[in-house]
From Swiss-Prot:
Source taxonomy: Bacteria, Pseudomonadati, Pseudomonadota, Gammaproteobacteria, Lysobacterales
The keyword Signal belongs to this UniProt entry's keyword annotation: no
Pathway assignment: Porphyrin-containing compound metabolism; protoporphyrin-IX biosynthesis; coproporphyrinogen-III from 5-aminolevulinate: step 2/4
Quaternary structure, from the entry: Monomer.
Organism of provenance: Xylella fastidiosa (strain M12)
Protein name from the UniProt record: Porphobilinogen deaminase
Comment on bound cofactor: Binds 1 dipyrromethane group covalently.
Family that this chain belongs to: Belongs to the HMBS family.
Length: 305
């Protein structure tokens, strides 16, 4: 029986996502023996500083990529929003699975919406993108960094450390925690991170056997949308250091891409959106990035450099 080893982070959410990928692979190839290889990454271990301060989201990938290079794993499963815009050779995105809910969720044990939070309420999130949008809609809020796994973050909310926190809807759904969502923060008013809600599988470019297996998981509409989002982010030189949001969706006759660049300090948001054919995501991403730059995003990006 052929064997396929999936490198994954040890967190409950990462394991759930990897188990889902494994189940899909077993459905596609019933004779395939799929096993998970759980690993700890530096991004999971260093929790007292922001991702921007310790090197960015790529810290969630490094150990998993090394496992593939050593021959200890055949592929790795990630939340696509955590995958850097450019994968260094010899790695590739072999599959992007059908997207789950791309929205963020406001979670509070007392207040029912962002608008109902009292003046000066304490809201926690580690994402600069979320902080910038919170600052735009509610400049009075007190914002705090919050890292750790989903249950750790929820525990801090439940202990009274904060009045509300913001997490990704998709992660909560995959953990069976939909009931904790107080309000969805969703497009078009609120934009997610590029690729948010999608699961990606990374493999070695040279491994044609694994690439062929994983290609059966790929969802073309999702891939086309996230290509547009990630191309926009790449053209802006975006990273976890920069508050960038993007969301592409299918509409009548084409694809629509909405993008934003924000500033946490003063809550400024620069927005742009364009439409194109569904197979022109790369061109659409570059065009929206240029619109953002022309509208003043260059100033905000320079301030974060």
């Amino acid at each position: 029986m052929p064997l396929l080893r999936i490198a994954t982070r040890k967190s409950l959410l990462a394991m759930r996502q990897s188990e889902y990928v494994a189940a899909r692979l077993r459905m596609l190839c019933p004779d395939l023996d799929v096993v998970l290889v759980p690993m700890s990454t530096r991004g999971d271990e260093i929790l007292d500083r922001s991702l921007a301060a310790i090197g960015g989201k790529g810290l969630f990938l490094k150990e998993l990529e090394l496992a593939m290079l050593r021959g200890d794993a055949d592929c790795a499963v990630h939340s696509l929003k955590d995958v850097p815009m450019d994968l260094e050779p010899p790695f590739m995105l072999a599959a992007v699975l059908s997207r789950d809910d791309p929205a963020d969720a406001l979670i509070s044990n007392v207040y029912l919406s962002l608008e109902s939070l009292p003046i000066g309420a304490r809201v926690a999130t580690s994402s600069l993108r979320r902080q910038a949008q919170l600052r735009f809609y509610r400049p009075d809020l007190r914002l705090f960094d919050l890292r750790g796994n989903v249950n750790t973050r929820l525990a801090k909310l439940d202990n009274g450390d904060y009045d509300a926190i913001v997490l990704a809807c998709a992660g909560l759904r995959r953990l069976g925690l939909e009931q904790r969502m107080t309000a969805r923060l969703a497009p078009p008013e609120w934009l997610p991170a590029p690729g948010q809600g999608a699961i990606a599988v990374e493999s070695l470019t040279e491994d044609a056997r694994i690439g062929t297996l994983l290609a059966g998981l790929d969802d073309l509409p999702t891939r086309q949308c996230v290509v547009a989002e990630r191309t926009m982010n790449r053209a802006l030189h975006g990273s976890c250091h920069v508050p960038v949001g993007a969301y592409a969706s299918y509409g009548v006759g084409g694809m629509r891409l909405q993008g934003l660049v924000g500033c946490v300090a003063d809550g400024r948001l620069v927005r742009a959106e364009l439409c194109s054919a569904k197979d022109e995501g790369d061109m659409l991403g570059r065009a929206v990035a240029q619109c953002l730059l022309d509208a003043g995003a260059a100033e905000l990006l320079a301030a974060t450099a």
